[in-house]
Structures are given as structure tokens and as C-alpha cells.
């Protein structure tokens, strides 16, 4: 009975999960009349007018928006992995006063809403004169309480004998950290993907810090939803479809690494 019930339940969950994405993709070829017609799944014709309008440059340079978002999310994810992994390594293997206090401070940062810190981050960036460019926005998100706690737990599972062996050989803690990075590569992939997803959909801080000609994807999607533009609904849906493609490709490429990290986390 369980062998029969499990595939049916799995298929039902997959169908429910995939339906919104399938509807959004098919609706990107529809007219407004077809979109608002109840029960209509397939378009009358697969006319890619919405995609042509996006890449025509009449609304904004969508290619530049896509590349800008990729650079921002990818760069911030890489630097966030390095910074939070180094902090987690220090908290897990270092011996200094205040280590426990720093760990609990990282936990409190997770509980504090990021939206409430946006104005403080903007003021900090303004004083450093790094507003209005991607590098300043990238720098503002590299420190994460979630990443610190995650990598602290990851490095606690690394045997202390490896650290002691490196010390016997006269290696510095900095060198030890980079030596251990290949051992935690699945964890790096997992957190990197998570941080990429979070940065990919960040809206408030880019809205505060970037110029109007430096749109990221969330800002571009919000601009398409502005009623003053009078764009067809299919254009916004087409932009949403294109915005999801990098996420699917990234997760599909690193899926095995993520699964390995999650399995190790559950076992431990």
C-alpha cells in the first residue's frame, strides 16, 4: 500500500508545485483577454511579443538589468561565503574571549528584520560614499548572521586533529582556513545558493541606494507593474519567467552538492 501511495503523493506534490510556473510561462504568450479568462491554460497562439518587447529596449535595457543582477547576486554570494565561513571558522576553532557572545549576537541578527536595518545600512553607505554603485550594495550584504551560525556548526564537525597538524607544520590560522575550504565545499555551495537567492530578490536596499538607471530585476519587475506604463500583463510574466531561469540553472548544477550538505547536516 505504501509503495503505491508514495509515488501518487509525490506526483501530486510535483503537480501542485509545477502548476504556477507552467501557468506563468504559458500566460507570457497570452493577451490580456486570455489571461483574465477563467480556466484557460493554453494560449491561442505562441506569439513571443512580450519577450520581443522586453529585449527591444522600449521599456528599459532588460539585458543590462539581467547582467547587473547576476553580477550583484553572484559577487555578493561569493564574498559572503568567504566572510561568513572565515567568521564561522574563528568561532568554531578559535580560542578567544567573547566567542560565545559573538555567536549569540549573530543569532540575534537573524531575528532582527532586515527591512528595519535598511535605513541604517543606507546611512552607513552614504557616509562611506559608496551609494549609487553595485560594489557598495554588494559590500552591504556580505555579513550575515545566518551564514556565521551555519559555518560555525559546519566547522565544529571538522576534526581538531587537522588543525593541530597544520599548527605542528607551522601554518598560520589563515592558511589553515583556506586548506579546509575544499572539505566543506558542499556547505559552501549550499549557503552560496541560498545567499544568491536572497540577494536576487532583494528590493528595498537597491531601491534606496541605486540610481534610477541602475535597475535590478526586482525593481524592473515592480516598474513593469506600474499602471502608468500600460504594458500588457504578459510582459511582466515574461520578465518573471526569465528571472527564474538563472535560479533553476544554478540549483540544478549544484543540486548534488546541496543534497550532500543537507544529508551531512541531518546525520550530524
Locate predicted features.
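A hydrophobic, multi-pass inner-membrane permease signature
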Residues: 1-268
Amino acid at each position: 500500500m505504501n509503495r503505491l501511495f508514495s509515488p501518487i503523493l509525490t506526483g501530486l506534490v510535483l503537480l501542485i508545485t509545477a502548476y504556477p510556473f507552467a501557468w506563468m510561462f504559458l500566460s507570457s504568450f497570452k493577451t490580456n483577454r486570455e489571461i483574465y479568462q477563467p480556466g484557460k491554460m493554453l494560449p491561442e497562439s505562441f506569439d513571443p511579443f512580450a519577450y520581443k518587447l522586453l529585449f527591444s529596449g522600449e521599456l528599459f535595457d532588460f539585458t543590462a538589468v539581467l547582467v547587473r543582477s547576476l553580477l550583484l547576486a553572484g559577487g555578493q554570494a561569493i564574498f559572503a561565503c568567504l566572510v561568513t565561513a572565515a567568521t564561522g571558522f574563528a568561532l568554531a576553532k578559535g580560542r578567544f574571549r567573547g566567542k560565545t557572545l559573538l555567536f549569540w549576537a549573530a543569532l540575534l541578527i537573524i531575528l532582527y528584520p532586515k527591512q528595519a536595518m535598511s535605513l541604517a545600512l543606507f546611512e552607513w553607505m552614504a557616509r562611506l560614499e559608496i551609494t549609487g554603485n553595485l560594489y557598495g550594495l554588494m559590500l552591504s550584504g556580505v555579513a550575515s548572521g545566518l551564514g556565521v551560525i551555519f559555518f560555525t556548526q559546519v566547522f565544529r564537525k571538522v576534526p581538531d586533529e587537522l588543525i593541530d597538524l597544520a599548527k605542528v607544520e607551522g601554518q598560520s590560522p589563515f592558511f589553515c582556513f583556506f586548506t579546509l575550504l575544499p572539505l566543506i565545499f558542499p556547505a559552501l555551495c549550499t549557503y552560496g545558493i541560498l545567499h544568491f537567492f536572497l540577494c536576487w530578490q532583494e528590493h528595498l536596499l537597491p531601491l534606496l541606494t541605486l540610481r534610477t538607471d541602475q535597475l535590478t530585476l526586482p525593481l524592473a519587475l515592480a516598474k513593469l507593474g506600474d499602471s502608468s506604463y500600460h504594458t500588457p500583463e504578459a510582459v511582466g510574466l515574461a520578465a518573471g519567467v526569465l528571472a527564474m531561469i538563472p535560479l533553476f540553472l544554478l540549483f540544478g548544477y549544484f543540486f548534488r552538492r546541496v543534497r550532500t550538505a543537507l544529508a551531512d547536516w541531518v546525520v550530524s
